[in-house]
UniProtKB/Swiss-Prot annotation:
GO BP: any one term: histamine catabolic process
Localization: Cytoplasm
Molecular-function GO term, any one: histamine N-methyltransferase activity
Record carries keyword Cytoplasm: yes
Keyword DNA repair appears in the UniProt entry: no
Name this polypeptide is given: Histamine N-methyltransferase
Subunit structure: Monomer.
Reactions it catalyzes: histamine + S-adenosyl-L-methionine = N(tau)-methylhistamine + S-adenosyl-L-homocysteine + H(+)
Taxonomic path: Eukaryota, Metazoa, Chordata, Craniata, Vertebrata
Tissues showing expression: Expressed in jejunum, brain > lung, spleen, stomach > liver, kidney.
Similarity section: Belongs to the class I-like SAM-binding methyltransferase superfamily. HNMT family.
Keyword terms, alphabetized: Cytoplasm, Methyltransferase, S-adenosyl-L-methionine, Transferase
Pfam families documented for this protein: Methyltransf_23
């Protein structure tokens, strides 16, 4: 690997911009919203029971777009019930954006928000020091298990926080997506980092089976439009390359042979489909629900 290549995570500003471009060029959030609209009401149908208050815990809530969509479903399912929504998010920038989104969003009455600037591991350590451990009715972990050191321990811990009839929702890339094939083939030749694990739903399901935890898994097709990646000098394409490879300035720092090989692969049927003149990378998602 060329010494000039460095992990995208080493430049937080560029990482968040690349992530924003990914969201703008993929059906990721559209796919999540479809799941929330069609499946979530059934999943949360029993979490409230006759309670006067429902406690929701968001691990890795980011800027809050999906959190608020989830809360709208909880609120619709349990009209008039008070909702406590606590958010664990390590990025101060994301928390600021989340608070700004809440401030300009209507219909959030009866919802009390609290934010904690910490990682899930830091949250776990803090909770374990408390004499009385808070139980939760609904915990969701959206695209964040990649950033956990010990995933089985994390799953076991959050499962232990579930109240009666409570659920956990985990969202991450499907083992059937193009990501698994891409990571298997290229991760050893791309910059290594200590922040991210290359896991898919296949890994999480295996861990849950080993832990004896009951779950259900749903897969939904999502795509990422990478057409701009093959237009010379296209800034959007350059940032999408960075996101795909998790490499800062991939096009200008990658060895020519590696760059050519990846560019060829990402135009082939193993990773993409062509539709209406667009090149679409398979970004399929898995939605895993865990019972108390």
């Amino acid at each position: 690997m060329a010494s000039s290549m460095r992990s995208l995570f080493s430049d937080h500003g560029r990482y968040f911009e690349a992530f924003r471009r990914f969201l703008n060029n993929s059906t990721e959030y559209q796919c999540m919203r479809e799941f929330m609209d069609k499946q979530l009401p059934g999943i949360i149908a029993r979490i409230g029971g006759s309670k006067s208050e429902i406690k929701v815990l968001s691990i890795g809530g980011g800027a809050g777009e999906m959190d608020l969509h989830i809360l709208s479903k909880v609120k619709a399912q349990y009209p008039g019930v008070h909702i406590i929504n606590e958010v664990v998010e390590p990025s101060a920038e994301q928390i600021t954006k989340y608070k700004e989104l809440v401030a300009k969003t209507s219909n959030l009455e009866n919802i009390k928000f609290a934010w904690h600037k910490e990682t899930s591991s830091e949250y776990q350590n803090r909770v374990m020091e408390q004499k009385e451990i808070q139980k939760w009715d609904f915990i969701h972990m959206i695209q964040m298990l990649y950033y956990v050191d010990d995933i089985p321990a994390t799953l076991k811990f959050f499962h232990s926080l579930l109240a009666t009839n409570a659920k956990i929702l985990i969202i991450l890339v499907s083992g059937k997506s193009g990501w698994l094939k891409f990571w298997k083939k290229y991760r050893s030749r791309l910059p290594q980092n200590d922040l991210c694990q290359y896991v898919t739903s296949f890994d999480i399901i295996q861990m849950l089976d080993s832990l004896g935890i009951k779950y259900q898994c749903y897969d939904l097709l999502s795509t990422m439009d990478i057409t701009d990646c093959f237009i010379d000098g296209n800034e959007n394409g350059e940032l999408l390359w960075d996101f795909l490879t998790e490499t800062c300035n991939f096009l200008t720092t990658a060895p020519p042979d590696l760059r050519a090989e990846i560019m060829k692969d990402l135009q082939g049927p193993e990773f993409i489909v062509r539709k209406e003149g667009k090149i679409l990378f398979d970004n399929s998602l898995s939605f895993i629900t865990i019972e108390a």
